[in-house]
A protein has these predicted regions:
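Short, small-residue-biased leader/transition segments that mark boundaries at the very start
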Residues: 3-5
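Catalytic-loop region of hydrolases
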Residues: 7-39, 48-49
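A short, structured surface patch at a secondary-structure boundary
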Residues: 30, 35-128, 134-141
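Short, structured coil segments at secondary-structure junctions
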Residues: 86, 152-153, 240-241, 301
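Extracytoplasmic substrate-binding proteins
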Residues: 112, 123-125, 129-223, 247-248, ...
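A ligand-binding cleft/hinge motif common to bilobed small-molecule-binding domains
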Residues: 141-151, 276-288
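Flexible, glycine-rich surface segments
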Residues: 196-197, 201-285
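Extended, charge-rich intrinsically disordered regulatory tails
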Residues: 287-299
Length: 352
């Protein structure tokens, strides 16, 4: 009877929107809808491609594993698949101009990887010609589906990892991607490494007697989007034992605030951490030119601003699945007396 099928839940420590259950003939991955947590976003039934399809499968999208020719929309997931040793399973990509990985650029030049165009409006003919075994893309709230690619009968893997609110929760999704690409042992050991490094760094920060207050980001247009207190970034500041000026805020995403509101709260912050995308690195004079109000911040006057130029630095490509790298940067910025963490990887002090 149904009752005697042995299952074993694969224990996940941090991810809140992912459940993995292994059965003898297949694995079920259930993705919780991050925008409506009582509902399921998607259920996948992972069946080894080498085995015949079992007769009685539960409801869900059947994916034959390991994937050997996937279309991967985002550079984050390309980078992860590469780190899992499954690079040859990437058959196509979208948004090539945002993908900094040299191996991907070379693959497209050589013709071993198809350039499927713009992720928002992919080249259907390219995708059809490729016959991929799955398409990995990031879902959006109320996206109203994925248009024509849904009719191709190719499994769509909804990469909702970015909606996890803890950095380790997001990184733990690599275990799902490991199962998809036949790299589960590698993914499990990589995640164990990330987890232990993160915990060790967190402990180092807790032992520090330095306690600096921190504000982040810049205004864009009329609004300044600051990370909510419960967002990934807000929680990272907390794990780095920095006093984040919006720590009390309850949002798990970014919140748009007026400049005055941020200034009232953060004008006296010890450290200011910014990310931007420009041809050349930003300086204090650039900040002043951009918006004179910035010069009123204590961190501007004391020259304690750190910037990450995402045009040159693989911040968005690496940090989702290596939050320990980002935590190490934040700890070195917020606890300058800790001098043996290998130097900054993403941020640097602004020049004049």
């Amino acid at each position: 009877s149904e009752m005697c099928i042995r299952d074993s839940t694969i224990p996940l420590r941090y991810a809140e929107n992912l459940t993995l259950v292994a059965y003898p003939e297949y694995t079920v991955a259930t993705l919780r809808n991050p925008w409506d947590t009582l509902r399921t976003l998607h259920t996948y039934i992972l069946v080894p491609a080498a085995e015949p399809l079992p007769a009685h499968l539960p409801q869900g999208t059947v994916v034959r594993t390991p994937l050997s020719k996937a279309v991967v929309y985002s550079s984050v997931h390309c980078g992860l698949v590469n780190n899992l040793g499954a690079f040859n399973s990437i058959g196509g990509i979208c948004d090539l101009k945002y993908i900094k990985l040299p191996v991907v650029q070379e693959g497209v030049k050589r013709g071993t990887i198809a350039d499927c165009g713009d992720g928002m409006n992919p080249d259907m003919e390219k995708i059809i010609d490729l016959h991929p075994d799955a398409i990995l893309l990031s879902p959006f709230e109320n996206s109203g589906g994925y248009g024509r690619i849904e009719k191709l009968n190719i499994p769509i893997i909804e990469c909702a990892d970015y909606m996890e609110t803890s950095a380790l929760g997001r990184a733990e999704w690599m275990r799902f991607y490991g199962l998809l690409f036949g790299a589960a042992p590698k993914a499990d050991s990589l995640f164990a490494e990330v987890d232990s490094c993160y915990k060790r760094l967190q402990h180092r920060a807790m032992l520090s007697s330095v306690s600096l207050s921190v504000v982040s980001e810049l205004k864009s247009g009329s609004a300044w989007y600051v990370p909510g207190g419960r967002s990934t970034m807000g929680r990272l500041f907390n794990d780095a034992c920095g006093r984040y000026v919006f720590a009390e805020d309850k949002h798990s995403g970014s919140i748009p605030l007026a400049f005055e509101t941020v200034f009232d709260k953060a004008g006296d912050a010890d450290v200011w951490i910014i990310k931007y995308n420009r041809d050349r690195d930003m300086s204090y004079s650039d900040l002043k030119t951009d918006y004179i109000g910035y010069t009123g911040f204590k961190a501007f006057k004391t020259r304690n601003i750190y910037g990450c130029n995402t045009a040159k630095v693989p911040f968005y490509e690496e940090t989702p699945f290596r939050p320990d790298y980002l935590l190490a940067d934040l700890i070195q910025i917020l606890h300058p007396e800790i001098g043996d963490l290998g130097g900054l990887r993403y941020f640097c002090k602004l020049n004049e």
